[in-house]
Amino acid sequence: MALYEAVIGLEVHAQLRTRSKLFCSCSTAFGSAPNTNVCEVCSGMPGVLPVPNARAVEYAARMGMAVNCTVNPVSVFARKNYFYPDLPKGYQISQFETPICEHGHLNISVNGQTRRIGITRIHMEDDAGKNIHSAGDNASYVDLNRSGVPLIEIVSEPDMRSAEEAVAYLKALHAIVVYLGICDGNMEEGSFRCDANVSIRPKGQQEFGTRAELKNLNSFRNVQRAIEYEIARQQDVLEDGDAVVQETRLYDAVKNVTVSMRGKEEAHDYRYFPDPDLMPVRIAEDDLVRWRADLPELPQARVARFMSAYDLSEQDADVLTADRALADFFEAATAACGQPKKVANLMQGALLRELNQRAVTVDAIAMRPEALGELVRIIEAGLISAKIANDIFGELVETGAMPEAFVKERGLVQISDTSAIETAVDEAIAENPAEVEAYKGGKTKLISFFMGQIMRKTKGKANPALVTELLQKKLG
């Protein structure tokens, strides 16, 4: 790739978390029985009139503010005309010449370097239905539950130069929509998805190469792998003396390849024109001021604050702010014990382990942040060892019990009585003379063996620091 550079732009669709659809009152609930959340409007019956969802307009504007866009006080819905079985009206209601937001940007960090990625526009549109193909009865079905669900499409400038930058940008957008509460960010269910436009050009050339549009990118990993494959494919085409063809390509995650769907000659002419059934969307200045004032602290600002206020590394701050609820949990736990680095370590280790095993988010568990803060406090006070804390962490997450009362009730309080530990140390030394001689002969790693023996004798409750001190003293 040394002779070429990649040019990448992303088109990201985020399904808005409204309770009703963009132009009717049907539910947006995911997973309902097919064709149960459908009415005359979202099924495209003649003679009905759409009514815009005010909450969707607010959410789109908030997103624009979060990524430094100009929010247009007047925007226009347009009809995007094409035929597909899951599009009952024969057109999609979108925005074209006058979108709700435009001219924004988002900063990303990759390998310690900060890049500014331009955002061309954000526009509102209604989603299509879903085609379901059944091989068993050789038939295809259409589920219109998704038809009319509100989306925003976030279109970037072609400013990314690698798959890593594209994923960093996508993750940054994902964090923002989740922080704002306007989208649940679920890529598996399709509520956050993207298409990638990828081309390559000789380094130093200003003119863009011929691009391919990649579809079926339903995870961050697939976005990275698909773009990497497509860059390599286009390079092979050029090095073989052929020309890259402008086309739409589907990513096959199993084979890790992109496959041609349709070429340029098959591309749609959407024949956009303003929707005659919808008035222009007008946003009052008072609403814009109020929405901007209500914006939460956004992920990048929170990362910077965590690094300065809590002295965390950028990596730790990134992990803890990736989810708004997780960041809130961290701050509440830190407030309970005053040990931000200890809290960060425990959350990134034991807590994330438990969340991943249960496949849940932190706001779905019984443990409260005050309990985690108390756990840090009793570890630091020597009431229990870090090992005991790790052993009981799953139960604390499951039950929501406060740690100090829990360990006292279970008899897990750490032994810090020197005489009691010294007895266990003396026994371990007396029972293992060969290991004692080997240790004295230079095999100092055997201290871990003796530590294990003593922990077995004390059922894991001996103070590790005191055990180490006594062992080193007695073994010489």
Swiss-Prot record:
First-level EC class: ligase
Keyword Transmembrane: no
Record keywords, A-Z: ATP-binding, Ligase, Nucleotide-binding, Protein biosynthesis
Ligase found in the keyword field: yes
Pfam families (UniProt xref): GatB_N, GatB_Yqey
GO biological process, one term: glutaminyl-tRNAGln biosynthesis via transamidation
InterPro entries: Asn/Gln-tRNA_amidoTrfase_suB/E, Asn/Gln-tRNA_Trfase_suB/E_cat, Asn/Gln_amidotransferase, Asn/Gln_tRNA_amidoTrase-B-like, GatB, GatB_C_1, GatB_Yqey_C_2, Gln-tRNA_amidoTrfase_suB_CS
Reactions the enzyme catalyzes: L-glutamyl-tRNA(Gln) + L-glutamine + ATP + H2O = L-glutaminyl-tRNA(Gln) + L-glutamate + ADP + phosphate + H(+); L-aspartyl-tRNA(Asn) + L-glutamine + ATP + H2O = L-asparaginyl-tRNA(Asn) + L-glutamate + ADP + phosphate + 2 H(+)
UniProt GO MF annotations: asparaginyl-tRNA synthase (glutamine-hydrolyzing) activity; ATP binding; glutaminyl-tRNA synthase (glutamine-hydrolyzing) activity
Family affiliation: Belongs to the GatB/GatE family. GatB subfamily.
Biological role stated in the UniProt entry: Allows the formation of correctly charged Asn-tRNA(Asn) or Gln-tRNA(Gln) through the transamidation of misacylated Asp-tRNA(Asn) or Glu-tRNA(Gln) in organisms which lack either or both of asparaginyl-tRNA or glutaminyl-tRNA synthetases. The reaction takes place in the presence of glutamine and ATP through an activated phospho-Asp-tRNA(Asn) or phospho-Glu-tRNA(Gln).
HAMAP family in the cross-refs: GatB
Subunit structure: Heterotrimer of A, B and C subunits.
Protein name: Aspartyl/glutamyl-tRNA(Asn/Gln) amidotransferase subunit B
Gene: gatB
